[in-house]
Regions:
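RNA-binding accessory domains that recognize and position tRNA/RNA substrates
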Residues: 1-180
Length: 180
């Protein structure tokens, strides 16, 4: 279930981790790049609703990550592709969410959710698999929730060097490229 602080409840299928999470609910309109969204530190403290209807079709390619781990507290999709089609794929999005403890929900009307968020602004919500939730207990928790100190959460503790990961980059300087 996805429960919003305004009382709206969406019923879907659990994806990723089955842990319960309260988070700020936001949406992203990208047609591709869900891995970049998942690994973008600017989404820390938020659960991201992807507006494009099919997510996961090219799987997870770890070389394409923006950072070493996913940052959103939750992930919301209309339809999750369970069989990726990509020769570079390391794992499915389901496996990636599970191994990183990120809960999510699939099978909900993400257009309706996006319309609510667009009209009312971002709001807090809960992703839960608890069928016996009590709305009268959940809503006050949602209204009280704050994202906390997300800058501290995403900031590196020590500097580090990022080494080239592709064969092309390891063979020396790239020619014929313009940097803007």
């Amino acid at each position: 279930f996805l429960i919003l602080e305004d009382g709206n409840v969406f019923t879907g299928t659990s994806i990723g981790s089955t842990r319960e999470v309260i988070s700020e609910i936001v949406f992203n309109t990208s047609m591709a790049g869900y891995l970049e969204v998942l690994t973008d530190p600017s989404y820390a403290g938020q659960a991201v609703c992807m507006t494009y209807p099919l997510i996961g079709n090219y799987g997870i390619c770890r070389d394409d990550c923006e950072s070493e781990r996913p940052w959103p507290d939750g992930f919301i999709v209309r339809e999750l592709s369970r069989i990726p089609s990509n020769f570079r794929c390391d794992c499915t999005i389901q496996e990636y969410l599970e191994e990183n403890g990120v809960p999510g929900i699939a099978g909900i009307d993400t257009r309706a959710l996006t319309k609510i968020l667009r009209e009312k602004g971002t709001m807090n919500g809960m992703i839960t698999t608890n069928e016996a939730y009590d709305l009268n207990e959940v809503l006050p928790k949602l209204k009280e929730y704050t994202t906390g100190k997300v800058v501290e959460k995403v900031t590196c503790r020590e500097k580090y060097v990022v080494a080239p990961t592709t064969e092309l980059a390891q063979n020396g300087p790239l020619s014929g490229l313009s940097l803007i």
